[in-house]
A protein has these predicted regions:
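Short linear motifs at protein or domain termini
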Residues: 1-69, 74, 78
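Short, flexible segments with low predicted structural confidence
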Residues: 20-24, 34-35, 50, 84, ...
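Short alpha-helical transmembrane interface motifs in multi-pass membrane proteins
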Residues: 45-46, 135-139
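Short, solvent-exposed loop/helix junctions and linker helices
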Residues: 46, 53, 101, 146-150
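Conserved amphipathic alpha-helical segments that form helical-bundle/coiled-coil interaction surfaces
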Residues: 73-137, 149-159, 167-171
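Solvent-exposed loop and edge beta-strand segments that line ligand/cofactor-binding
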Residues: 141-145
Length: 171
């Protein structure tokens, strides 16, 4: 349960902005507000999570294709450097799920944020906010998942550099 009063006290504000923030989070399906019970962090069923990840994968592929088509050489160089950082972080023996997730999110932000389609970017970011705590940190905590992700990074960056939209989006 999320206590409006406790949150307001912690941040030194009245309950009104806290209530408004919780309402906005409810619109994003990050929290659920129940009458006479208050707000709580929203949980998702396996089916809902699976559906979110399927949609996110489609949006990611399209976003990468659009980035490959529209990006400047400088944007591509930045993405490549961020991809190298994912590989460096992922190979670290003491890497945490949080650190690996942050590295992959940096690449994703570069690609999706510069794909040239504001609606796709907004939808992707909203879906990421909903699912991040369920997926990124937990999944990126496993060595097997990190190896899978790292296996896609270099081929995707090479496809982007070659302006091969289809190959880049498929990875």
């Amino acid at each position: 349960r999320l206590s409006e009063e406790a949150i307001a006290r912690r941040f030194g504000v009245s309950r009104t902005p806290v209530r408004e923030a919780l309402r906005l989070l409810a619109q994003e399906e990050i929290v659920a507000i129940e009458p006479r019970r208050g707000a709580r962090v929203r949980s998702y069923s396996r089916t809902e999570l699976s559906e979110m990840f399927e949609m996110r994968a489609v949006l990611y592929g399209l976003g990468v294709e659009l980035f490959t088509r529209r990006a400047t050489a400088e944007m591509i160089a930045t993405a490549d450097q961020l991809g190298r950082e994912v590989l460096k972080v992922g190979k670290s023996p003491n890497v945490t799920g949080e650190a690996f997730a942050a590295a992959t999110q940096a690449v994703t932000s570069q690609l999706i944020g510069n794909c040239g389609n504001a609606r796709l970017t907004d939808t992707f970011r909203r879906m990421t906010r909903r699912s991040f705590r369920h997926f990124a940190i937990l999944a990126h905590s496993t060595p097997v998942h990190r190896e899978i992700v790292m296996g896609y990074v270099r081929p995707m960056m090479d496809a982007i550099a070659a302006r091969d939209e289809r190959a880049a989006g498929a990875l």
